[in-house]
Amino acid sequence: MSLTLTPSRQLPEVDAFIQCAMVMEAQPFLDALVPLPGSHAVETLVVGADGHHQQSYALGQLEGHTVVVITSGIGIANAAAAVARGLTLATPKIVIAGGTAGGLEGGIQVGDIAGAISTIYNDADATVFGYELGQIPRMPVDYHSSQRAIDALAGLNDAQPHHVRTGRIVTGDSFASEKVVARIRAGFPDALAVDMETCGMAQVCWSNGVDWICLRAISDLTGEGADEDFHMNGEKAAYHSFEAICAYLSLFCK
């Protein structure tokens, strides 16, 4: 038997990966998936040891688009690992972060869609070595969506019922309590929203030359009281993201 680290086959192409942290966020997509033509069921792969953290991949069609719905688990490492593994299974035209996020910028409202086209880590600090706040050493300052991905956002407000705000989302592994939000706002005053996954996903996409965008619904406004209250039911916010992503796919893939 010969040993090789070279991929032995051409990876199938799909329209999109849709990365969600939690089953609650992924469920609207999973409910809407139908089998690919010629298949009898949606193909599902679960990776991870029994009794430990597991990540799932569901391949099917979503309103005519071939997608892989990835349920990664919460946090930067889980999102990065899940998308990196996904890229060994298929080649997407774009990776879309779905689900929920916390609103930061004053004009964003609960239920709005954070159409994030740039992202940076909110808790990375290598400034002592001359890097920008939020920048990982030897990586870009932040990560940006392509012009094609940005252009597809232009019609999204008219294509679905939720208001879309375009800007930057910041990512960290700390829940957005009042203390954490004060630090984030001081360091990243232009940030639209905060989550725990998008930048990890975007870094993997950048490393592999794959496009990405984030279309998360705002479930709460961060800061005072954020550790006690969600201002919109999580399932409802996740459905807002689902509706926005379905509409976006039609705009991006046309």
Give the location of each predicted region.
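Mid-sequence, gly/pro-rich, charge-dense loop/helix-turn segments that line enzyme active sites
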Residues: 100, 104-188
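Proline-aspartate-enriched helix->loop->beta-strand connector
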Residues: 91-96
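Short glycine-/acidic-enriched loop or helix-start segments at secondary-structure transitions
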Residues: 28-30, 80, 106-107, 124-125, ...
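A C-terminal functional module that forms or caps the active site or interfaces directly
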Residues: 174-227
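N-terminal short beta-loop-beta anion/metal-coordinating cradle
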Residues: 2-81
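His/Asp/Glu-rich mid-to-C-terminal helical/loop segments that flank catalytic regions of hydrolases
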Residues: 223-254
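Short, well-structured alpha-helical segments in soluble
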Residues: 82-90
